[in-house]
Amino acid sequence: RSEDDRRAVIEGLADGTIDAISSDHMPVDRDAKMQPFGPAQPGASAVDTLLALCLTLVHQGQISMTRMIEALSMAPASILDIEGGTLSPGGAADFILFRPHSSWIITGANFISDSRITPFESHPVQGLVDATYVNGLAVFTRD
C-alpha cells in the first residue's frame, strides 16, 4: 500500500469513517508460510499483536484511546448485532487488563497463538495484555 493509503486508513479510523478494527487472526504453520510468495499460504498470527499495534496509533496521537477501544470492542459487537463490547450489569464480562505503556519487542517465538509467524518480527511496541476474561473467567493470564 502507498503512504497515502496508509494515512487515509488512519484518518478514516480517527474520524469514524472506518467503524471497526479486526485482526483477521489466521495462524499459519511455518512450513506453509516459508514458500515463495505465490504458493505460500495466506495468513499470520495477529491476536498476539493487535492491541500493541493499535496502541501505537494512540501513542503517536493519531487516534484517541477511546476511539481505539470503541473500534476494537463496541463497534464490532454492534456491526455483528451481538451482545458485548461494553461492561454492563447482567452483560457478558468479556474484557482485558493491559498496561498501555509497557514496552516490548514483537517476537513470534513468544506468541501464545498456534502460529509464530508475524510480519512485525522484531518491531518495538508499547502495550501488553496481562489478562483476558470471557464471561468473567480468566482465559489468559501473563505469568
Question: For each of these PLM feature ranges, what is it?
Answer:
Residues 1-4, 41-45, 118-125:
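A short acidic, glycine-rich active-site loop
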Residues 1-10, 79-80:
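Active-site glycine- and acidic-residue-rich loops that bind
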Residues 2, 29, 43, 106-107:
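Alpha-helix initiation/capping motif
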Residues 12-21, 26-101:
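His/Asp/Glu-enriched, well-ordered alpha-helical/loop segment
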Residues 36, 92-143:
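C-terminal cap of metal-dependent C-N hydrolases
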